[in-house]
Regions:
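Active-site metal-binding loops of divalent metal-dependent hydrolases
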Residues: 20-22, 52-54, 80-81, 96-99, ...
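Extracytoplasmic/secreted cell-surface and envelope-processing proteins
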Residues: 26-27, 57-59, 86, 140-142, ...
Length: 174
């Protein structure tokens, strides 16, 4: 995480989007995730959405994690939007919870429908819509509803990670 924090500091982003799976349900160590979050929020405003790993830990562990994020000043978006403004530009930043928080469905059609139900009322055609949603495999759903930019997680290694050709595509994940 120190390298990531250093890269973020150098990049000077306007915002930092955390798109879930910041904790690992198989090896839950909140301190690692919270240390990263604590450093990230010093760099830029941070917006966080849940991933499937957050849904898979106990409710007590997740509640403790989220409470800590909020105390640090991180905006946790649960199927809601915030308006970002700069000069004349308005951006709707929309955060959708991972569908595993709603239903332990494994069929893509069911999860896609859950996401559409949560996302549709939040999109605003007067603004540029940036959607934070954990699941890249539902990109077609997001685009069909009117999302102009979608930032996702879930791929654990990223769909982008180029230097010496890492990442780019994760099978069955968008």
């Amino acid at each position: 995480n120190n390298d990531l924090v250093e890269m973020l500091t150098f990049a000077k982003p306007d915002i930092i989007a955390m798109t879930g799976d910041i904790i690992d349900s198989n090896n839950t160590d909140l301190d690692i995730a919270l240390h990263f979050a604590e450093e990230a929020v010093k760099i830029a405003p941070c917006y966080y959405i849940t991933g499937n790993h957050e849904a898979w830990v106990s409710e007590n562990i997740y509640s403790e994690f989220e409470d800590n994020l909020i105390e640090m000043g991180i905006s946790v978006l649960h199927n809601e939007k915030v308006l970002l403004e700069r000069e004349e530009a308005k951006i709707s930043l929309i955060g959708i919870d991972d569908p595993d928080f709603f239903e332990r469905a494994t069929l893509g059609g069911i999860q896609g429908a859950i996401i559409e139900t949560k996302l549709s009322p939040l999109l605003d055609n007067r603004n540029y819509n940036i959607v934070l949603c954990h699941r890249p495999e539902f990109f077609d759903n997001y685009a069909a509803l009117g999302a102009e930019l979608v930032l996702t997680g879930h791929a654990h290694g990223g769909q982008f990670r180029l230097p010496v050709i890492g990442g780019l595509i994760a099978p069955n994940q968008g």
